[in-house]
Design a protein with these regions (language model features):
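Conserved pre-motif I regulatory segment
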Residues: 28-79
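Walker A/P-loop NTP-binding motif
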Residues: 61-66, 85-100, 196, 227
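Conserved Helicase C-terminal RecA-like lobe
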Residues: 71-75, 81, 89, 94-98, ...
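Conserved helicase ATPase motor motifs in RecA-like P-loop NTPase domains
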Residues: 82, 203-216
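Conserved Walker A/P-loop ATP-binding site and its immediately adjacent core
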Residues: 100-120, 376-379
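Conserved helix-turn-beta segment of the N-terminal RecA-like "Helicase ATP-binding" lobe
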Residues: 111-132, 230
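Inter-lobe coupling linker of SF2 helicases/translocases
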Residues: 149-150, 154-155, 168-171, 192-202, ...
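A conserved SF2-helicase RecA2
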Residues: 473-482, 486-532
């Protein structure tokens, strides 16, 4: 990136009038005016002015206004840790550097959240390009709208009857600015949604995600390709660090001086408690071969995992969590010789994992902390719910069966946020933080969540104990899950319990132990985001 000072060979002095200095001074004035406008705006909408947000807005405005952007790219990657206000940065850019046409692309779970943010902070209801609205609106009308919100599914091209790709009305418009929220949804280069994102035309592009790397460096390359940085992206890690130093903004809570209660993590190693359970686990694991993984072969291992029969991996995980999940698959496994013909799943009376999770939750009841349990399967959620309720605890759950509009209500158990606001004349009638206080009284003792359904769009800072029943392949998913509770507003320390089944004998590791090792290597790869 070029220096912000004029050419050292130019005779500097009072009243320097070179074109470059004049441009920079003009840009600085515009940025300063926008920052002051932001400061004046904050009190009226109930935003506390924070230094890290001012610095973030200044960074964003520079990358929108810079006369000659690096590699010709305006915008960048906003990768601040969850809870630092990435959405507010984008709202500030929209308000204080107004553009004629801004498109926001996001997961469906965040649609109403973003609409609410616009209504609250800007007094504007954006057009939602989805469903019948998308079908009926004309391209001319779309081009006249200042803000359009849509989902990743809507930018994905459709295959026509003659096997050609048809792009949406959104692709026929020259957008001033595009914001991709939860941009890690674009990490797969081979998907139609990534192709659709690359084909959208815009002067400014923002990728907003706390996890720009989920599995491997190619995730980051995929985002850079949408930004327009593919030609300057190299495999050299030192050059990648230089590139990120220009185009990526990443801060942690610690770095910006936000002091939250600590997160304490405990790995709970679980032994196989019965011979029947161990015997079946050994048979199922015998079908898998776990290759040693390190930073040099992590990309190849991830590719292998993607090619490996999903059923075998799924069965190994289900066996570790709750063997009864395999009930329908037993006949097929017997037919293929994976397990003996005389093996009966009914002989497995209990699940070592379920027993351990329930015992820990019930045993920790006296802490007074509410428990957030992240699970993988509906059957697992159902049995945990039954056992915890039998122990006298109040339990709610969220899984793929839960409609988006019901998720917040289940977290609160008694009343939803819209219902609460309906008794107030306006949003501003609510004392700051009052809803969080009410949450702390209404939330259930235990909330069980299917991990892939609740890592976006939900704040759960009224829970202080987190349980992962089984490790996820992607550590970023677990980090996001923890961040739902460990965020601004959390007043107690957060205890995290990670349950892992032990190995099955000498030099034999369980599926979950291998999964945990894969996580460790992926975390090492992610350190490039922190310039390490």
């Amino acid at each position: 990136m070029s220096s912000l000072n004029c050419d050292p060979s130019w005779p500097l002095g009072d009243g320097c009038s070179c074109w470059r200095c004049n441009r920079l001074e003009q840009q600085d004035r515009v940025t300063a005016d926008s920052l002051q406008a932001y400061r004046d705006w904050c009190p009226g909408v109930g935003i506390d002015e924070k230094h890290h947000q001012l610095q973030g807005i200044k960074w964003c405005l520079y990358h929108e206004l810079v006369e000659k952007p690096n590699a010709g790219v305006r915008g960048g990657i906003i990768a601040d840790e969850m809870g630092l206000g990435k959405t507010i940065l984008m709202i500030a850019c929209i308000r204080h550097n107004f553009k004629a046409r801004t498109l926001i692309v996001l997961p469906p779970a965040l649609l109403q959240q973003w609409v609410g943010v616009f209504q609250r902070f800007l007094g504007h209801t954006p057009f939602v390009y989805r469903g019948s609205k998308a079908k009926n609106v004309t391209i001319e009308k779309l081009a006249q709208l200042p803000v359009v919100i849509t989902t990743y599914g809507m930018i994905s091209p459709r295959r026509t009857d003659d096997d050609k790709l048809a792009y949406s009305k959104l692709h026929k418009i020259e957008w001033s600015r595009i914001i991709y929220d939860e941009a890690h949804h674009l990490r797969n280069l081979k998907t139609k949604v990534h192709d659709g994102a690359c084909m959208l035309k815009a002067d400014i592009r923002w990728m907003v995600t706390g996890t720009p790397i989920n599995n491997k460096l190619k995730d980051l390359y995929a985002l850079c390709k949408v930004l327009g940085l593919a030609k300057v992206f190299t495999p050299n890690k030192e050059e990648i660090k230089l590139l990120l130093g220009i185009h990526l903004l990443r801060r942690t809570k610690d770095q910006v001086g936000i002091n939250l209660p600590p997160v304490k993590t405990q790995v709970v190693e679980v032994d196989w408690s019965s011979d029947a359970e161990r015997d079946m686990a050994e048979d199922i694991h015998s079908m898998l071969h776990f290759t040693t993984i390190n930073k040099n072969n992590v990309d190849e291992i991830i590719a292998w995992l993607n090619r490996h029969p999903l059923a075998a991996l799924t069965r190994a995980r289900q066996m570790c969590i709750y063997p009864q999940l395999l009930h329908k698959a037993v006949k097929k496994m017997k037919r293929k010789g994976i397990i003996p013909q005389d093996m009966n799943i009914k002989d497995i009376k209990t699940s070592s994992k379920i027993t351990s999770v329930v015992d820990h939750i019930v045993g920790n009841r006296q802490t007074g902390k509410r428990k957030l349990v992240f699970s993988h399967y509906r059957g697992e959620i159902d049995v945990l719910t039954e056992k915890l309720r039998n122990a006298g605890m109040t339990v709610q759950s969220i899984d793929g069966r839960t409609k988006t509009r019901n998720k917040k209500q289940r977290i609160l158990s008694v009343v939803s946020e819209p219902q609460f606001h309906s008794v107030c004349k306006t949003w501003n009638d609510l004392p700051e933080g009052i809803f969080g206080v009410i949450n702390s009284f209404l939330a259930p003792e235990v909330m069980i969540v299917q991990i892939q359904t609740a890592c976006e769009g939900l704040n759960m800072q009224h829970f202080q104990e987190i349980y992962f029943t089984s490790p996820h392949w992607n550590p970023a998913v677990e980090d996001q899950a923890v961040a739902r509770a460990h965020r601004i507003g959390q007043e107690k320390s957060v205890d995290v319990y990670r349950f892992v089944m032990n190995g099955l004998g000498r030099n034999s590791i369980s599926f979950e132990q291998y999964c945990s090792h894969v996580q460790d290597i992926k975390r090492e790869v992610m350190q490039i985001l922190n310039n390490k």
